[in-house]
Amino acid sequence: VEEQAKLVDEAFEFGALEVGAAVGVTNNYLERARSLQRSGCRIICVDIAHGHHKLMERALSNIRSALGDGVHIMAGNIATGYAAHDLVAWGADSLRVGIGGGSICKTRIETGHGVPTLHSIFECYGTDIGATLIADGGIKNSGDIVKALAAGADFVMIGSLLAGTDESPGDVFITDDGRKRKLYRGMASKEAQKDWRGSYSSIEGITSSVEYKGSVENVLLELDQGIRSGLSYSGARTLAELRENAAFIIQTSAGAVESSTHI
């Protein structure tokens, strides 16, 4: 608890205007949430793999009662409209939508459960519950961000796109053929679980490496340019106009091949 609060303090010292931090739904989650609030954290993410759960209901209710309305509570992950409706009723302000779509996640393979992220966004947005929706998983490029926003997401979460940058965790190493790379691992991988809790169970992530990308600023600039261009193709100046103007179609595998560079 103290170590996480210290990380929040350090983020503010580095000039962060807003800091969010994650808690679970068991053990000392409420103590942790209170500690984070005292450190100035105004965004608490209640983060579990299967968010539509009775333990989530208990945690959201307790955190809301303890911290009041001054804290923004993010919760997830979920994949259905039913889950979106329930989590908002339990006290969530924003929802992380997507199960098993991450580049280093193998939940769908190991458990047989999960829904394509874009479908989940459509379904949760269609419930019209008024909560902020965050597309989480499967975002590979700026085009995927545009699609998620057009489907109803207010934000996206990205991991692999930022992995390999100077600002991401891990050391740069050089491969036998002289290329620079950085380690990238899922929090549900065996290696990550052993590091943070000393043991592992239900391995639903992998460890890999990605190409070294330099400063995160360059990555964000390219994403920003792609998103702006994407809005222009739908004649949109705002996200609301994008959702109104964009049209979705069913695409074949041949169409997907044509959509990528194929020289």
Tell where the protein language model's regions lie, with residue ranges.
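General structural signal for secondary-structure boundaries
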Residues: V1-E3, R42, S215, E222
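Short amphipathic alpha-helical segments, especially helix-boundary/capping motifs
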Residues: V8-E10, S35-S39, A59, V97-G101, ...
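Active-site beta->alpha loop and helix N-cap motifs at the rims of alpha/beta catalytic domains
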Residues: A16-C45, A49-H50
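Hydrophobic faces of well-ordered beta-strands that scaffold small-molecule active sites
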Residues: L17-V23, I44-V46, I73-G76, L95-V97, ...
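Alpha/beta catalytic cores of nucleotide-metabolism and tRNA/nucleoside-modifying enzymes
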Residues: A22, G68, A89-D93, G112-A135, ...
